[in-house]
Amino acid sequence: MGGSILLGIFWHFVGATSAACFYAPMKKVTNWSWETMWAIAGIFSWILLPWGISYWLLPDFGSYYSFFGSDILLPVFLFGAMWGIGNIGYGLTMRYLGMSMGIGIAIGITLIVGTLMTPIIQGRFGELLASTGGQMTLIGVVIAVVGVAVVSYAGLLKEKAIGVTAEEFNLKKGLALAVMCGIFSAGMSFAMSAATPMHEEAARLGVDPLYVALPSYVVIMGGGAIINLGFCIIRLITRPELSFKADMSVVKGLLISNILFSALGGIMWYFQFFFYAWGHANIPANYGFMSWMLHMSFYVLCGGIVGLLLHEWKDTGKKPTRVLCIGCLIIVLAANIVGLGMAN
């Protein structure tokens, strides 16, 4: 396995670790509605950081974006909005199916759709099936889905052991949302593929290869921001039990800490895709679609590891923990098989 591919896999792991941890500081937020917290975090993750970092990277911020026509910018933006819809659906999936079943179905679907649809649309799927390297990467994708399923099963065992159930369990509604969420969440993978001309132009302007994908986040995350912030604002306006004014009226010390914890969560959320860009830059161009598989499978892996480190599995018994470890090892195996396939 080449050093560049190993480095790419490593950076995807770092990004997934940030993704698995971003909600931890947001759990410290108190006496605020979820909508206010999510909106404040989103301002940092979807607007301030993408714009600020891109302004710093690009020699001429305005001329870079004006260089592209709507034929490039609109698909990138719409795929970002598509991902934003999936992001909202993810939370609703947890409500109706519970964490484990919801994550297992939604992540499994988005891993498959986001990874395989790109080569299918590009007409390259047959080429993958015909080559040894392509066959190995596809086997790795299948094994990764198995790993996600095993980790999700471990979570189901954990929930049963500690008596946790879904907030409003509804199998029919939950499955429909999980499928929708899985498909729409893959919009980020499609957006990255559609933004390839933006990456190439950034490289032409002298942006370091590790950073060439970051300017496209202004457009991608702009699409996601409109959906997510719009959702939060509409709920804050229309739901009588929610009040942005009341959230902003808490005592000064709590207000500052809530803003800081929300901002920290948003910053950590952004850095999952900051390092995604680094990982993507080290993956061979003809296997760029595998970045999504690595990110999503590592996200599940890191979520399991973080849970173990935080002793969330301490009182669940040996079986759930054992199944979790097996699932994590399967995901590690999948990543190695994909890496070997890309190097073949």
UniProtKB/Swiss-Prot annotation:
One GO MF term: rhamnose transmembrane transporter activity
Entry GO terms, CC: plasma membrane
Coarse class of the protein's main subcellular location: membrane
UniProt KW keywords: Cell inner membrane, Cell membrane, Membrane, Sugar transport, Symport, Transmembrane, Transmembrane helix, Transport
Regions that span the bilayer: 5-25, 38-58, 72-92, 101-121, 137-157, 175-195, 214-234, 259-279, 289-309, 323-343
Keyword ATP-binding carried by entry: no
Disulphide-bonded residues: none
Reaction(s) catalysed (UniProt annotation): L-rhamnopyranose(in) + H(+)(in) = L-rhamnopyranose(out) + H(+)(out)
Keyword RNA-binding: no
Localization: Cell inner membrane
Pfam family, one: RhaT
Matching NCBIfam families: PRK13499.1-1 (NF010021), PRK13499.1-3 (NF010023)
Protein name listed in UniProt: L-rhamnose-proton symporter
